């Protein structure tokens, strides 16, 4: 029985392959990533996932494993801000760490053939026509860049379009809103890249936010995490989760220390909602998403609610 009353497809045995290395002469070091996929599949849809600040390819198992068990190939890179990379604070790449993340995502899209070569057997094929993205926290901004989100460069006072036509849309989870006066002094001094604009983020997206996500980087409250929905053009949907803090019940990993609001039922809800949305977004089928919207249409629902705009 599912929380949202959707009919999940057959659960697959999954495989995970790491560490896959992609060479990029502009990066100084190889990009590394992990692929989690159904054991028995061909021509599968792809989810390109961006981890939060400091995390790595080993994070977010509760999401990646679920998506893979139910038909998606999930690709998780490790970005330069990861604690496992331990980039020096004076490294010249630090001020543009946000942009290096986006470049890594595009590198993966450029080298899908190489990734396929790492997979066992001859039958594995990635469906290039069905690619979506997702990210949590800082990773939501990274995913959003592929959808049209633009970051203000404080040195040039310009914004750059880094959207990618290969990506159909995505999911932004607990993602920061606009910067400027919304930021604390600490955030202004240490995270200058938290200056996104959502006005050009025109691709379809689902935004997920917790109504108890009090982020220390902003002078606003949890509504800051809802700005990617409210300040962007449609089509968009917003899932507001009651009682959820930044880890939204435990999506960042199994038994991870950073989870402050452990709630397996909430994680299960997010798994179901995101799976249904990806199926809708990539035109696999639409009944599951319609059922999710119906189940969470009432604000009196115990766990949260969904609203949408076109």
Identify the function of each model-found stretch.
Residues 58-81:
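Short amphipathic alpha-helix adjacent to the substrate-entry channel of hydrolases
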Residues 158-240:
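The feature captures the conserved acid-bearing segment of alpha/beta-hydrolase catalytic domains
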Residues 1-42:
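N-terminal cap/lid segment of alpha/beta-hydrolase-fold proteins
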Residues 113, 140-153:
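Short glycine-enriched nucleophile-adjacent loop
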Residues 43-52:
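Short beta-strand element of the alpha/beta-hydrolase
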Residues 94-128:
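Alpha/beta-hydrolase active-site loop
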Residues 243-245, 251-310:
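Alpha/beta-hydrolase-fold serine-hydrolase catalytic core, especially in secreted/extracellular enzymes
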Residues 80-100, 252-254:
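Cap/lid segment of the alpha/beta-hydrolase catalytic domain
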